[in-house]
């Protein structure tokens, strides 16, 4: 198989994306799910945004919270000079000094999903507004890295749903990329990089998934089965890294 890089790369950059709020800036547009719909190539993009901080001593954290039964973005502000116990060296997150990655306190960006369309798969126009925005209950820290699987006339979108409790995998479906139906978390934290097969095998849906053990073992690929795309089980190890890696 011959593979060539597109001479028009990158297809999308942060400069192509309009922030969802005036006080936000675009940090990245990446890790897109891709499919075809009505003669167009659809990219469902992860768009990462962060708060514009005018004070260099401040780190602003956007999160989604439930307020009066509505989902709203709230901003938490840390002053570096007042928080010597915290580590701000990695611009992607705030963590406790001397602790491992699992002690991340907050992410500095909030990701949503946005649609870009193309007639030729090269030149894309990205929507001005988010297609799907995170909710407080499942995605208070953002929704990331969508993957699209078409089964019959329905497009199933699995994506990483992030909260303070970890990164799991949730499911959304659509028939037209205008209306979306949420189905909730299908793999609990920490489990991500899910790939749903486009056809049943022996009458059941099948998916690769990647649980992340924190004690014994390493992140490796597992395979799971489901009768309805919601309830997954029959997990078994599929493959992993070699012993000399």
Model-identified regions with their sequence ranges:
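Beta-rich carbohydrate-recognition and catalytic domains
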Residues: 1-141, 149-195, 199-245
């Amino acid at each position: 198989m011959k593979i060539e890089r597109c001479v028009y790369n990158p297809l999308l950059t942060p400069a192509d994306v309009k922030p969802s709020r005036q006080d936000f800036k675009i940090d990245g547009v990446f890790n897109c799910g891709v499919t075809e719909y009505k003669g167009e190539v659809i990219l469902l993009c992860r768009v990462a945004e962060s708060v514009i901080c005018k004070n260099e001593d401040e780190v602003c954290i956007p999160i989604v919270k439930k307020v009066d039964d509505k989902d709203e973005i709230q901003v938490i502000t840390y002053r570096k000079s007042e928080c010597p116990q915290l580590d701000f060296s990695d611009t992607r997150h705030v963590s406790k000094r001397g602790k491992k990655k699992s002690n991340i306190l907050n992410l500095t960006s909030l990701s949503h999903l946005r649609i870009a369309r193309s007639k030729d798969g090269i030149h894309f126009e990205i929507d001005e507004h988010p297609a799907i925005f995170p909710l407080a209950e499942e995605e208070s820290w953002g929704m990331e890295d969508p993957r699209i699987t078409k089964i019959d006339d329905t497009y199933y979108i699995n994506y990483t749903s992030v909260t303070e409790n970890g990164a799991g995998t949730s499911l959304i479906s659509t028939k037209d990329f205008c209306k979306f139906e949420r189905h909730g978390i299908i793999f609990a934290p920490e489990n991500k990089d899910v790939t749903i097969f486009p056809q049943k095998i022996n009458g059941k849906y099948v998916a690769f998934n990647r649980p992340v053990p924190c004690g014994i073992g390493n992140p490796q690929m597992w395979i799971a089965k489901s009768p309805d795309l919601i309830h997954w089980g029959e997990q078994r190890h599929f493959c992993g890294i070699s012993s000399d890696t």
